[in-house]
Amino acid sequence: MKILVTGASGLLGQELCPMLDSIGAQYWATNSKIFDITNAKMVNEIMDKVSLDYIIHLAAFTNVDQAEVNQEEAYRINHLGTKNMAKIAKKLDVPIIYISSASVFDGEKLTPYKTTDATNPINVYGKSKLMGEEEIRKITKKHYIIRTSSLYGKGGSNYVDAMLTYSMFNSSISVVDDQILCPTWTRDLSKEIINILSGGKEYGTYHICSSGRTNWSEFTKKIFDIKRRSVFVQPILKSDFPRPAKRPKFSVLDNGNILPSWEESLEKYLLQK
């Protein structure tokens, strides 16, 4: 099995690539320095020389606040770059796996979002990821669009590791408690991507995230509890902590309970550190 992985040096890529090794897949792990997905001419010239079975498109502009500041760059990567990769997938007649986000929804629901629910992103990041989804659906039927939420894991900058570092030097922190989410371990998501590569899943859109729901304050407390860190967590409202990008109030996805609970996965992740 021959696979192109874009954004392989990112948070999810660093978890996924060793799993690809474990199943004996041949893969080309790329990053923006050697494979600029926004440069259609370069992408086509390179891909004309290779044969593939899958494209796993992880490359993205993921900094939600910076997307508001650098809107052109966010759309260039998440929209145009994804469009280019969809065209390559169509040209080579291979499936493309695209990682999208719960941010394509506005957060006004009170129950987990289904794949069939109407999208309505409220920030540039969500809008750009949705535009990527739309390009893929328009260009190729052979696609797996995976929406996920609030990733953490080894090998990259993420909230969980940031809190562990913070706890080494501080005794208290204020964290919002009116944003509901489903934080997801990159290992769990990577396993589901491997399952897709194994075959049998219909093309389409999937929600893959940890089961259950929490808020940022509760999630932070759990991190400190598991690692026995003495840090007081003060719940605050998101209105008390203004940021450049609007955040949905509710970002829980209906995943059919295919993954473990967020508590179980968080504990497994932290106990190995």
Which ranges hold each PLM region?
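Mid/C-terminal beta-alpha module of Rossmann-like enzyme folds, strongest
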Residues: 192, 199-244, 270
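Catalytic helix-loop patch of NAD(P)-dependent Rossmann-fold dehydrogenases
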Residues: 76, 80-84, 91, 104-146, ...
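Adenosine-cofactor binding site in Rossmann-like domains, unifying the SAM/SAH pocket
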Residues: 21-45
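NAD(P)-dependent short-chain dehydrogenase/reductase
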Residues: 134-181, 187-188, 194
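C-terminal amphipathic/interface module of NAD(P)-dependent oxidoreductases
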Residues: 229-231, 246-273
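NAD(P)H-binding glycine-rich loop region in Rossmannoid oxidoreductase-like domains
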Residues: 41-77, 88
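SDR active-site strand-loop-helix element
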Residues: 6, 30, 55-59, 96-102, ...
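N-terminal Rossmann NAD(P)H-binding glycine-rich loop of SDR-like oxidoreductase domains
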Residues: 3-22
